[in-house]
Amino acid sequence: MAGPLGKDLLGLAPLSAEQIRLVLDTAIPFREISERAIKKVPTLRGATIVNLFFEASTRTRISFEFAEKRLSADTVNVAVAGSSVSKGETLVDTARNLEAMKIDMVVIRHPASGAARFLAERIESNVINAGDGTNEHPTQGLLDMLTLRDRLGDLAGKRICIVGDVLHSRVARSNIWGLKKLGAEVAVCGPRSLLPNAIGEMGVTVFDRVEAAIEWADALNILRLQLERMQAGYIPSLREYNRVFGVTSARLEHASRDLLILHPGPMNRGVEIDSDVADGPHSVILDQVTNGVAVRMAVLYLLAGGKPELADAAQKGVA
């Protein structure tokens, strides 16, 4: 029987505000586990989870693995470069072979938009999207919202601006969908060449100057330039990008209120963000990393059929 999130977590666009709040609320008791000397509860003991990453990842893959192990699940990491995929095996054949070994969940990252949904429609195991092309990265969006909610309280009416390479960013799309469902005002800022043509249809404000975005916002979520997805011509140079759109301490003087600084990583210091901002008093970047494990524990728990009202008991290792 499907849990409160359904069978899979493929994106934030299909979720209701109530489902998003459910994940954020469920993550809070799980966050305490990471503060303990013994960082493990038996909640998913006996479950087998496969991490199937077709793209390079450090934070997301490790965060999922920590979340799985802290819930006592058996974790299998498939190195695609050394698997049968490198010999021409299809995504579905790989997953079906894994499912024949009686797994329970698949966490997938893939360069093709829609890959997670394609897989979820063809296997019975739960599927969690850890990033598919430029489509969505739902757990990153959720952890960003938890980090914002920790500091700002109810996000309704709060102003969040996403700065940088929105065109190639699945993080931006998940944040836009999720934040708007929670009633936040969302804006984007970046070179027009790095903003989707139809960005206005998502109901966001567009800023051409980062100074104006800083003056408007309660928080900035700063994105790196995804050079690996670009052909030549999107920006004149990295130096020019930093000069015009880089978030610096001098630019933060334009803020009309205390401003939170988020970044999903990896950071390119000196390009989209300067070190004194990344490491400064307004930065909650490391809080995002901490919250990432808790949010992913909550998602795993809920997809496995865990009852939200028992999350506190699960956190104590008795449910």
UniProtKB/Swiss-Prot annotation:
Binding locations of carbamoyl phosphate: R59, T60, R109, H137, Q140, G265, P266
A molecular-function term among this protein's GO annotations: amino acid binding
> Reaction(s) catalyzed by this protein?
carbamoyl phosphate + L-aspartate = N-carbamoyl-L-aspartate + phosphate + H(+)
Q: Which PROSITE patterns match?
A: CARBAMOYLTRANSFERASE
Q: Which GO terms describe its cellular component?
A: cytosol
Q: What is its EC number?
A: 2.1.3.2
What are its GO biological-process terms? Answer: 'de novo' pyrimidine nucleobase biosynthetic process; 'de novo' UMP biosynthetic process; amino acid metabolic process
Q: Where are the transmembrane segments?
A: none
Q: Which residues bind L-aspartate?
A: K87, R170, R224
Q: Which family does it belong to?
A: Belongs to the aspartate/ornithine carbamoyltransferase superfamily. ATCase family.
What is the role of this chain?
Answer: Catalyzes the condensation of carbamoyl phosphate and aspartate to form carbamoyl aspartate and inorganic phosphate, the committed step in the de novo pyrimidine nucleotide biosynthesis pathway.
| Subunit composition and interactions | Heterododecamer (2C3:3R2) of six catalytic PyrB chains organized as two trimers (C3), and six regulatory PyrI chains organized as three dimers (R2).
Tell me what this protein is called: Aspartate carbamoyltransferase catalytic subunit
